[in-house]
Design a protein with these regions (language model features):
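Hydrophobic transmembrane alpha-helices
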Residues: 1-45, 51-52, 59
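Residue-level signature of transmembrane alpha-helical entry/exit and packing/kink sites
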Residues: 4-15, 36, 49, 53, ...
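Residue-level signature of the transmembrane alpha-helical core
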Residues: 13-17, 37, 41, 54-62, ...
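Interfacial aromatic-anchored transmembrane helix boundaries in multi-pass membrane proteins
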Residues: 20-33, 58-92
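Hydrophobic alpha-helical transmembrane segments
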Residues: 23-30, 51-57, 91-107, 160
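Transmembrane alpha-helices and membrane-interface helical segments
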Residues: 40-45, 87-92, 163
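Juxtamembrane membrane-interface segments at transmembrane alpha-helix termini
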Residues: 46-54, 67-72, 90-97, 118-119
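Membrane-embedded alpha-helical hairpins and interfacial helices in multi-pass inner-membrane proteins
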Residues: 72-77, 92, 99-181
């Protein structure tokens, strides 16, 4: 594993900010954003170090949520485990897999992540609001349409994996040639 340095700190913090901005830019369209796309691309290129960007994204989301709601909004807590799940799935893709396979798997993982977002969010809802089984099923079924929208949005966003992946690979190769630390 490469040594972590200042350049990496700036790079992965910037990616974390991009994750947050991709969420904000599409705010008017429920559950459509570029977070899954960026998690996939950053993880394909930078592998395990991509988790840093996800943690930065979660911290920015937490701080803005707490500031905007004067400390009374906890909806971001499930992000602590929901987005690392997608990262883990992408980490399971072998480094040497053909790019077409990587893109196909990321598209499937992103779609499933969007479709199952409500299911992954449910444990927090059950604990936070003391939901019984009937209430949990009602909450989950009320959000199915939003999970379907989330899935479709994630799959559509994944059409950008190839150009973003190629761009990041070129930038990383250029960085290696110039020996930036």
């Amino acid at each position: 594993m490469k040594k972590f340095n200042i350049f990496d700190m700036v790079l992965f913090t910037m990616f974390g900010v991009l994750l947050y901005l991709s969420d904000i830019v599409f705010e008017l369209i429920p559950n459509v954003h570029g977070v899954a796309l960026l998690i996939c691309v950053i993880t394909l290129v930078y592998r395990s170090r991509a988790i840093i960007s996800i943690l930065v994204y979660i911290m920015i989301t937490m701080v803005t949520s707490l500031v905007v709601s004067a400390g009374h909004s906890l909806w971001w807590i499930p992000y602590i485990y929901i987005f690392p799940i997608l990262w883990l799935l992408v980490m399971l893709i072998p480094k040497k897999a053909p790019l077409k396979v990587k893109i196909a798997l990321c598209t499937v993982f992103s779609g499933l992540h969007g479709l199952l977002f409500g299911v992954m969010y449910l444990p927090f809802q059950v604990i936070m609001y003391n939901l019984n089984l009937e209430m949990a099923i009602a909450w989950l079924s009320a959000g199915v349409i939003f999970d379907v929208i989330h899935m479709v949005g994630n799959i559509a966003m994944c059409s950008l994996i190839y150009p973003l992946y190629k761009t990041l690979i070129k930038l990383e190769e250029s960085r290696q040639k110039k020996n930036y630390r």
